[in-house]
Design a protein with these regions (language model features):
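ABC family nucleotide-binding domain
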Residues: 1-140
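C-terminal boundary and immediately downstream tail of ABC-type ATPase nucleotide-binding domains
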Residues: 130-131, 135, 141-160
Length: 160
């Protein structure tokens, strides 16, 4: 699960942040975990940042370290909760590219977002909620192309 706040340990490097849970929680061998952590940093386009501390990284880079950290646990599902909310447009794009790559590789994902254009592109199914209540759901083409509910239409007119 990833949130808008990165929740990285500030006193640990990017590599150490990624390695911690597989070693401490899963009991995996350090050498194996370290090799995987290096691979994951390359996967999220942060190769060469292994020794960087969170405070030395941009918001988008920190979010991608958080994604790599989650992937280190080999999840079958990723939950992204407003992961681009606090990011500027350039770093937002970096994170969205990473999420798109994971989806294209077959990672099952649940994405809570206000990035409607992105959701329309990558989602198999979209749920539109208002104050925690599902207002409407369906395939992206139907929901974005011909929303049935007035609340959905009004929102989409404002953001698209």
């Amino acid at each position: 699960m990833l949130f808008r706040s990165y929740n990285l340990f500030p006193h640990k490097t990017a590599l150490e942040n990624i390695m911690m849970a597989p070693i401490d929680v899963l009991g995996q061998p350090r050498a194996e975990v370290e090799a995987r952590a290096h691979e994951l940093l390359k996967k999220v386009r942060l190769g060469g940042k292994e020794s960087s501390y969170p405070g030395e990284l941009s918001g988008g880079q920190q979010q991608r370290v958080a994604i790599a950290r989650a992937l280190a646990m080999r999840p079958s599902l990723m939950l992204f909760d407003e992961v681009t909310a606090a990011l500027d447009p350039e770093t937002r794009k970096e994170v969205l590219v990473t999420i798109r790559q994971l989806v294209e590789e077959g990672m099952t994902s649940i994405l809570v977002t206000h990035e409607m254009a992105f959701a329309r592109e990558i989602a198999d199914h979209v749920y539109f909620t208002d104050h925690g209540v599902i207002v409407e759901d369906g395939p992206p083409a139907a929901l974005f192309g011909a929303p049935q509910k007035e609340r959905t239409r009004a929102f989409l007119e404002q953001v698209l």
